[in-house]
């Protein structure tokens, strides 16, 4: 993977990539646009550093609400058309105090059940690269406190 491909994978501007790498913008631009400039070892280290800094895993990195919203909208429309009525983000991500190891709490209204619901959960985890806590809205009838939290602090991300 090239420096340009790595930068675009993480949706970074050249200025942001240079800042993360602690190199002048002009130097970064030369490395990205001219393969004969500098050493291959430095270029590989720049790529590795960008991946280390920007990569999202279950225990590293934070997702934006916008990223969660866009990723799940695409998943629901492509893989589960007409099967997801709505989805709310709640918990630490919705309240704005998520940490790198925070899970993503989601409440969905869906007709999926059994292994199909488990498959939905796994698809979301795979796309977001984070642990998720997926609850079905219909299962919350006896949990008024959680319903109130979702209605008060939750962010509608689909439906």
Segment roles from a protein language model:
Residues 105-108:
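Short beta-strand->loop micro-motif that forms the acidic, two-metal-ion catalytic signature
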Residues 1-83, 95-100, 110-159:
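Catalytic core of pol beta-like nucleotidyltransferases
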Residues 91-93:
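Short helix-loop-helix/strand-helix junction enriched in hydrophobic and basic residues
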